[in-house]
């Protein structure tokens, strides 16, 4: 489902329709962010997860977790196995944007960061 009209690719996002798909045990993929400027796809993911009352956010990205600094740029980056929302924001970590983390915090949504570069992480 998409936030902007791309009828040849996917149906438009309508919350109640997405809920009905899930009730029928269908897989629903949300694409194209929120359709609004200034909101990242990370924020859109947390927003949609909140709307759908999801239990968790799974973020596939280039790195295999949260680091104290970008491991692609810094060889001495240290992996952080677990971090609170507040510490994530205070340490200015960038794997997800602050708006997404703040919204996840407000909703109590846990987030798992995993690498999409590792084929064993993709089902």
Describe every region a protein language model picked out.
Residues 1-2:
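A short acidic/basic microdomain associated with nuclease active sites
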Residues 33-34:
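Short glycine-/small-residue-rich Rossmann-like dinucleotide-binding loops
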Residues 30:
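Short, acidic/hydrophobic/Gly-rich beta-strand patch recurrent on exposed beta strands
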Residues 5-27, 37-123:
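Active-site phosphate/oxyanion-binding loops
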